[in-house]
């Protein structure tokens, strides 16, 4: 899966938007959360459901989860659920909040720092959160792929950040805890210098739940970087 595939999906949905009441996209589970997040921003304000689903076990297996996931996905696509969602193992997850948290279990995805939109029981969609949408959707057809990810480790100096920012327009930094950054090795000066040159630096956390708060530490508070406190990595990307 590559960003150009996301744009292909957007074009397909846009060209057929007036012909159908909902859309189902079957997708591999490894990068499904990235696609759901991307489509959530590339197709905004859709009153029609755009559902992604897949399976942990192939459809040819007796124990496959593909049949129930597909059935649930089409049930949701035929509902009034707006926007982009992942439907998996009876759970309905907002596209910008999904994260793959299990590699083998049927419950492959979790909703991070946000409740499930709903759940399916005996073929009925029970919505926990009702998000009404009556707007006209907007479709985008451009992406900037020059984004890098840096996961901090103890003792890390500025060399990796310099390397990525020389070659990309934006850098996502997975920091420690609520937003801790190294105070040694010129790390702060490195980031501040690149930001002043027009680069985009985003701070998030390696911890999956409860988000970040870069203002807790002085080095994070004084840095002129963007902080997304409760979003998943695929959504930030």
Model-predicted segments: where are they?
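Short, acidic/small-residue loops that bind anionic groups at enzyme active sites
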Residues: 38-65, 78, 195-205
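ATP/NTP phosphate-donor binding region
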Residues: 1-14
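Conserved small/polar residues in nucleotide/adenosyl-binding loops
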Residues: 229-235
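Internal gly/pro-rich beta-alpha loop/helix module
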Residues: 52-121
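Short Gly/Thr/Asp-enriched flexible loops that form oxyanion-binding sites at enzyme active sites
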Residues: 26-47, 183-190
């Amino acid at each position: 899966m590559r960003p150009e595939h996301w744009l292909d999906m957007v074009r397909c949905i846009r060209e057929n938007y007036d012909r159908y009441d909902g859309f189902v996209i079957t997708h591999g589970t490894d990068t499904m959360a990235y696609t759901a997040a991307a489509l959530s921003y590339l197709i905004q304000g859709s009153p029609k459901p755009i559902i992604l689903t897949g399976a942990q076990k192939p459809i040819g297996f007796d124990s496959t989860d593909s049949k129930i996931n597909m059935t649930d996905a089409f049930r949701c696509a035929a509902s009034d659920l707006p926007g982009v969602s992942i439907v998996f193992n009876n759970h309905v997850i907002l596209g910008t909040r999904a994260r793959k948290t299990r590699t083998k279990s049927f419950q492959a995805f979790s909703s991070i720092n946000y409740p499930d939109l709903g759940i399916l029981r005996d073929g009925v969609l029970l919505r926990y959160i009702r998000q009404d949408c009556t707007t006209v959707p907007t479709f985008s057809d451009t992406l900037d792929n020059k984004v890098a990810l840096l996961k901090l480790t103890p003792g890390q100096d500025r060399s990796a950040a310099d390397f990525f920012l020389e070659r990309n327009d934006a850098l996502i930094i997975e920091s420690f805890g609520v937003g801790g950054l190294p105070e040694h090795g010129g790390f702060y000066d490195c980031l501040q210098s690149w930001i002043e040159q027009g680069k985009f630096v985003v701070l998030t956390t390696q911890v999956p739940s409860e988000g970040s708060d870069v203002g807790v530490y002085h080095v994070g508070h004084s840095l002129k970087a963007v902080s997304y406190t409760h979003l998943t990595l695929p959504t930030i990307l």
